[in-house]
Amino acid sequence: MQKVVEFLQKNPVQYLATVGRDGKAKCRPFMFCFEQDGKLWFCTNNTKDVYKDMLANPEVEVSVSSPEYAWIRLHGKAVFEDNKSVMEGCMNNPIVKGQYQTADNPIFEVFYLENPHGV
């Protein structure tokens, strides 16, 4: 897990693939927040289609590559959790802080990948 976390941290822009509510594949740039308690945490906004898509079908994949063309692809189930500790931790990222200002922002959501595995 530590090697995966290090790779995600070194390559901050990942791509999150979901199945949209229209049944079509969707792929969006995303950013890994951090690992806590063995979970890979990400965040999003509950007004976005990606949030609604993951609620409807939580099976997702995250893909990321390095400038040297090394890459990983992780499959897992997106699990949303009202976890204030994680929300506060996400605020350490200036991009997240700039978008949401505080961990108490009502549109701010965090999720982790349940049973992530490489594919």
PLM region spans:
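Acidic-histidine catalytic/liganding microenvironments
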Residues: 11, 57, 93
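Charged, gly/pro-rich active-site loop segments
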Residues: 73-119
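A short, Trp-centered hydrophobic/proline-enriched beta-strand micro-motif
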Residues: 6-21, 60-64
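Charged, amphipathic alpha-helical segments
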Residues: 1-2, 44-47, 95-96
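A short mixed-secondary-structure module that forms the rim of ligand-binding clefts
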Residues: 33-69
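General beta-strand recognition
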Residues: 15, 40-41, 119
